Amino acid sequence: MTQLWVERTGTRRYIGRSTRGAQVLVGSEDVDGVFTPGELLKIALAACSGMASDQPLARRLGDDYQAVVKVSGAADRDQERYPLIEETMELDLSGLTEDEKERLLVVINRAVELACTVGRTLKSGTTVNLEVVDVGA
């Protein structure tokens, strides 16, 4: 299984890493060139929805179909959580009939509901444990 971690690079700035060599810059909203943790959460959801629906869409629209999944959601700063996250999947469906479009919407929603682990986790909630380890001893 891929290992994930973040390393502190400055005040409220981190770099996220994986054992597969991926990196992402994380920081405060006032820092250019970084994602906030909340933005990464929303991007993970959008990417998961796109990936979960990729094969059904490719079968119906062709392997080279274009898709953009936009995602948004304001934080409730009193509760420090996102009470609502909204996604919009933009596709060119002009080559489909109205019936085909309706069927495709059902297929997309079913694929995302069944295969998007991020969305399923957000909708059901999860347990998070934090352990603090003294590495200086």
Curated annotation (Swiss-Prot):
Pfam families for this protein: OsmC (PF02566)
InterPro entries, alphabetized: KH_dom-like_a/b, OsmC/Ohr_fam, OsmC/Ohrsf
Gene Ontology CC annotations of this record: plasma membrane
Gene3D superfamilies in alphabetical order: 3.30.300.20
Protein name: Uncharacterized protein Rv2923c
Organism encoding this protein: Mycobacterium tuberculosis (strain ATCC 25618 / H37Rv)
